[in-house]
Amino acid sequence: TDRIYPIADVLFSGPMKRCLETAQILYPGQTPICIPEWTEMDFGAFEGHNYQELSGDPAYQRWIDSGGTLPFPEGESREEFIRRNVAGYEKMLCYMKMILERSAASEQGDYNTGSEKTELERSDEIGAQDAGIQSVSAVVHGGTIMALLSHFLGEQYFNYQVKCGQGYSGRLVFLAGGGTPEWKEFRPLSEFTKGETY
């Protein structure tokens, strides 16, 4: 690829084939940790249809007139989609906590090498714990980007719309004493230079 993407010590991905294949192209040799909640929105009765096929459908016109806020017939609402993606983000944070704890325990010689292993340990999906984690990447659908950023940054959902191969980078700050980590210093990936970490 000619595009520039940040390096990733840990790689996450949505579970759909497009995300997994893209993750392998952008990060060859790394196996992403799949977050099942990061699938595309359920378009219900509109799934697989284009604008021409749906024009004239009263349900589609109601959805358009709502600015995309109504639920898709037999599908998800935007709010449901955002909640699902936020649940996936929280799962990603749990994985990160597990990875960091495992790394710290390994440094202290306390790492469990017995048969009682977590799903993450069994899958052997992480490769950079020993060197420390400096950067994490997630290969996801544009809708997941819009859902998560609008939820956490409070701006309009469509303000974060991206084209294929585009995305954002930011710094996640973990607060002393726990609590919800805060996102800082967002910028589009197009502002990166090759091999830069964030």
Residue ranges and their predicted role:
Residues 25, 147-151:
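Active-site signature of alpha/beta-hydrolase-fold catalytic machinery across serine-
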Residues 44-52, 94, 98-103, 109-114, ...:
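Acidic, low-complexity terminal tails and accessory targeting/binding regions
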Residues 17-19, 88, 144-145:
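Alpha-helix capping/helix-boundary segments
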Residues 2, 82, 86-97, 101:
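Generic structural signal for well-ordered alpha-helical scaffold segments
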Residues 26-86, 198:
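Phosphate-handling substructures
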Residues 1-30:
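Active-site-proximal alpha-helix that buttresses catalytic centers in soluble enzyme cores
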Residues 13-14, 83, 139-140:
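Short beta-strand scaffold positions
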Residues 9, 133-142:
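Generic beta-sheet signal
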